[in-house]
Design a protein with these regions (language model features):
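N-terminal short beta-loop-beta anion/metal-coordinating cradle
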Residues: 35-75
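A short aromatic-anchored loop/beta-hairpin motif
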Residues: 2-44
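Short HxH-centered metal-ligating active-site micro-motif
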Residues: 14, 66-119
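Fold-independent oxyanion-binding glycine-rich loops
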Residues: 24-25, 59-61, 82-83, 112
Length: 119
C-alpha cells in the first residue's frame, strides 16, 4: 500500500487516497495482494497512536472483510461496522471521532450486494 495511507505521515489529497483504495481493491480482485503493514513491527509502530487516512462505514457481514478487500494493513483504515452500514447513534459517534479527533480526510460509506440487513 502506498505511503500516503501510512499512519506516520500527514494527510494528502482525498483523490489520491481514493485512488489507493481502488488500487488495493484491484489487487484483491486479481489475487495479487501485498498484505501491507501486517507485521508485528507495524503493531509496535502504532503503540503511540493511530493516524488513518480513511474512515469507512461498512456492513458487519463477515463475508466482506474491509481491510482484506482493500489490501490494507494495521492502522491504514478506521473501520466502523454495523448491520446494514446504517448511521446509528454508535456509528455517528465513531464517525465524529474519526473526523474530529483522528482528522481523517476521507469518509467512505460502503454497502454490498445481497445485504440481509437491508432487505
Amino acid at each position: 500500500m502506498s505511503d500516503y495511507l501510512d499512519s506516520d505521515i500527514s494527510p494528502c489529497s482525498p483523490y489520491l487516497i481514493i485512488d489507493e483504495l481502488k488500487r488495493g481493491f484491484e489487487r484483491f480482485k486479481s489475487g495479487r495482494t501485498d498484505h501491507p503493514h501486517a507485521t508485528a513491527a507495524r503493531v509496535h509502530q502504532l503503540i503511540g497512536g493511530q493516524h488513518p487516512q480513511v474512515a469507512l462505514l461498512a456492513c458487519s457481514d463477515s463475508r466482506v472483510p474491509i481491510e482484506v478487500i482493500f489490501d490494507a494493513g494495521f492502522g491504514d483504515l478506521f473501520v466502523i461496522r454495523n448491520a446494514g452500514n446504517t448511521n446509528t447513534f454508535g456509528s455517528a459517534g465513531s464517525i465524529e471521532y474519526a473526523v474530529l479527533d483522528l482528522k481523517v480526510p476521507v469518509l467512505v460509506v460502503m454497502s454490498h450486494q445481497g445485504c440481509g440487513a437491508v432487505k
